[in-house]
A protein has these predicted regions:
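Short, acidic/turn-prone active-site loops that include or flank metal/cofactor-
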Residues: 87-94, 141-147
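Glycine-rich phosphate-binding loop signature in dinucleotide/nucleotide-binding domains
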Residues: 55-57, 109-116, 180-184
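Short, acidic loop-to-helix structural element flanking the phosphoryl-transfer center
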Residues: 11-12, 16, 20-61, 71, ...
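Conserved Lys-Pro-Asp/Glu-containing loop-to-beta segment of HAD-superfamily phosphomonoesterases
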Residues: 97-131
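Helix-loop "lid/cap" segments that line or gate small-molecule binding pockets
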Residues: 1-13
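Acidic, Mg2+-coordinating phosphoryl-transfer loop and its flanking beta/alpha structural elements
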Residues: 119-165
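Short acidic-hydrophobic, aromatic-tinged amphipathic segments that line or gate anion-handling sites
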Residues: 88, 164-172
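Substrate-recognition/cap helix-loop segment adjacent to the acidic, metal-dependent catalytic center
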Residues: 36, 46, 50-60, 64-91, ...
C-alpha cells in the first residue's frame, strides 16, 4: 500500500486574518460562479489525485492552516472526499499538531515502512521529514500566481531539503503516476 501526504494548499506568508479574508472573498466568487475550481488548484492537481485513487492509494491532506478552514475549503472546492486518509490542519498548539507528527501517525497507524510513504509538498519541512523515514519525496517548485510553471528559488530549496523528484505542476499526470508506480 502506497500512502500519500498531499499538499494542495501553497505556502503563503500572510497573517491568518489576512489569509482568511482572501479565502472568504475567493469562496464567495466560487459560489457566485465568477471563479471555478481550477482557479484555486495547481494545473492538473485534481486529475492527479483521481489517478492515484484509481491505483488504490489512500490520500491524506496536511496543511499549516487551521484544520476547520482546510476542511471547509476542501469541501467548498468539492475534493474533500478524495482525502480518505484524513484532512489535517493546525489546531493552534504545536505540541498537538505538526507535519512531523502527521507523518509519524500515518506510518504507525498503517504499519508502513518509510519507503511506502510518498510525500508531495512545496515546503522543506515535509520534504525533510519524509526523507528522515526513507519515504519518497516529490517537491512542487511551482509558480503560485500562475498555478503552473517552475519557481527556481523553490526548486533550489526543495533539492537542498532532499526532494528526489521536482515538478512544477501536475500537467504530466500520467507520466508522474507511471514513475511513482515503477517497480524498482
Amino acid at each position: 500500500l502506497l500512502d500519500i501526504l498531499f499538499y494542495l494548499r501553497q505556502s503563503i506568508t500572510y497573517t491568518d486574518k489576512d489569509l482568511m479574508k482572501m479565502v472568504d472573498k475567493r469562496m464567495t466568487k466560487l459560489k457566485s460562479g465568477q471563479l471555478i475550481v481550477q482557479d484555486f488548484t495547481m494545473k492538473g492537481a485534481v486529475d492527479f489525485l483521481y489517478a492515484l485513487k484509481e491505483k488504490g492509494v489512500r490520500i491524506y491532506l496536511a496543511s499549516g492552516t487551521d484544520k476547520a478552514d482546510v476542511i471547509n475549503e476542501a469541501e467548498s472546492l468539492g475534493y474533500a472526499a478524495i482525502f480518505d486518509g484524513g484532512i489535517y490542519g493546525s489546531v493552534g498548539d504545536i505540541s498537538k499538531y505538526s507535519k512531523k507528527m502527521v507523518l509519524e501517525d500515518i506510518i504507525r497507524e498503517n504499519n508502513l515502512k518509510g519507503s511506502e510513504m510518498l510525500v508531495i509538498g512545496d515546503g522543506p519541512v515535509e520534504i525533510k521529514e519524509c526523507r528522515k523515514v526513507n519515504g519518497i519525496a516529490i517537491g512542487i517548485a511551482s509558480d503560485e500566481v500562475r498555478r503552473y510553471g517552475l519557481n527556481q528559488e523553490k526548486r533550489s530549496r526543495l533539492i537542498k531539503s532532499g526532494a528526489q523528484i521536482i515538478i512544477s505542476d501536475f500537467s504530466q499526470t500520467q507520466e508522474l503516476v507511471d514513475l511513482i508506480f515503477t517497480k524498482r
